[in-house]
Swiss-Prot record:
It comes from Streptococcus suis (strain 05ZYH33). This is Segregation and condensation protein A. Gene3D superfamilies: 6.10.250.2410, Structural maintenance of chromosome 1. Chain E. One of its GO terms (cellular component) is cytoplasm. GO terms for biological process: cell division; chromosome segregation; DNA replication. NCBIfam families: PRK00104.1-2. Belongs to the ScpA family. Participates in chromosomal partition during cell division. May act via the formation of a condensin-like complex containing Smc and ScpB that pull DNA away from mid-cell into both cell halves.
Amino acid sequence: MDIKLKDFEGPLDLLLHLVSKYQVDIYEVPITEVIEQYLAYIATLQAMRLEVAGEYMLMASQLMVIKSRRLLPKVVEQIDPEDDPEMDLLDQLEEYRKFKLLSEKLGEQHDERANYFSKPKLDLIYDDVQLAKDKTVIDIFLAFSKVMAEKQASLRQSHATIARDEYKIEDMMDFVRSRFETGPRLELRQLFQESQDVNEMITIFLATLELVKVHEIVLEQTETFGDIYLVRSEDESLS
């Protein structure tokens, strides 16, 4: 199965998406939290064996430098803004935000004209998966990134080392369906409580997306960065 996420135009676009969730001025966002979310997102894509462009990895290394500097003791000397990688990053984000707004306005004008002459492009991707309150598939991946990081830490502590590769999405779709036998709603992280390795978690996650895509379940996230819940569709029987 080919998986394609929402196309970001580059690492700044991904960072701007994360920053926008806080609904505050760019210079007031909790940058350490944003960095951790970015790194978790990239790590999840790598674990799922999805290709990550070099520019995203370069940004990841720069973010790790910024994060490490924040962990160091504060120094008395005034830091030159030109030598501050954190301020430089925020400046880049602000400039990119302005550029993106202008590009979107121009794009809307172009699309208006194009609709009269051509058919819109159809992509078979998971970007059409929508959550409540205007959430997107990227929010699902961010939530899954957090769950997977927690589960990996737990597996390391329990010294679990057995990994299998033969998990099938079809089987895991049946597994997800079975979890609704006790009720119509469950938390995403509950699906992974008994997972024994990362491959199993990834297959369960992909199975969940597939069930959303075929409208057997819907996903809800009632607050930014909050837990995601799976809700059985009223139009489908999952038993």
